[in-house]
Amino acid sequence: MDDEYLALLDRAYKLVSPKAQRRAEIPKIEVVNMPRKTIIQNFGAIAKRLNRDVYLMAKFFQKELAVPGTVEGDVFTLHGEKSPKVVEAVYERFIKYYVVCPVCNSIDTELRREGRIFVLHCLACGASTPVRPL
């Protein structure tokens, strides 16, 4: 019976483990400074991975950094020179407030708008939490 249990346990780990690891990864942000511009090269890929609208994320970055910006494909250009550390701090704040579930700490969430209120709905535990409007 122990051998059968261990075989089933190994099979379960093989089926669940890769997907669980992929879901828990938060992508790194790639920031490049140019004269009078700051470019985030993998912005579209990050938005897709976090299940967020690119323009919603861009709006957050523009408000937090107080500079205008444009989205072109996967690239987000901020029209102002900002330190990569500052941009990474804003990215971490976005993840904290608009991506991570406060109940179970999962990033498997979606941001819904219900009337004038934004609600963070967790797909892992089912919790719904109101968040600050953008």
UniProtKB/Swiss-Prot annotation:
The keyword Magnesium does not apply. The keyword S-adenosyl-L-methionine does not apply. Disulfide bonds: none annotated. InterPro entries: IF2/IF5, TIF2_bsu_arc, Transl_init_fac_IF2/IF5_dom, Transl_init_fac_IF2/IF5_N, Transl_init_fac_IF2/IF5_Zn-bd. NCBIfam families: PRK03988.1. eIF-2 functions in the early steps of protein synthesis by forming a ternary complex with GTP and initiator tRNA. Heterotrimer composed of an alpha, a beta and a gamma chain. Belongs to the eIF-2-beta/eIF-5 family. This is Translation initiation factor 2 subunit beta. The gene is eif2b.
